[in-house]
Amino acid sequence: MKEGSVMTEILAIDDDRGILEVIRRALSREGYHVTTLDDPQKLDESQLPRYQLILLDVMMPGMDGFQLCRKIRDRVDCPILFLTAKTDEKDLMEGLGIGGDDYITKPFGIGELRARVSAHIRRENRERKHNAV
């Protein structure tokens, strides 16, 4: 969150609570405020506009990350990054085709997670600054 004084809000959704805790700790140390959900059904869609970035696990029981992305993409303009163990080109193309902005392959390193999140946040901040001029 080195780009400004307003705390950047990130939403992470994954059915694995251990991964959510790793994400929360890693990104909180960078100054981000991270909200975690272990079930996409618990998402309060009225809160979506507050997030500047969303991390979505692809493979979750009930509603998977692709289904959730399709459901919310037209209501959010922030980056959506998929977390997945799926590495097929078909899955990658599907995720990007439905509105995902990037993929982070599991298992992922903390450095990669922080770098990708930071890069997307920086780009969003540049676009907002440019559009405000």
Where are these predicted regions, by residue range?
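C-terminal output helix
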Residues: 108-121
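Short, Lys/Arg-enriched segments at the junction into DNA-binding effector domains
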Residues: 9, 119-133
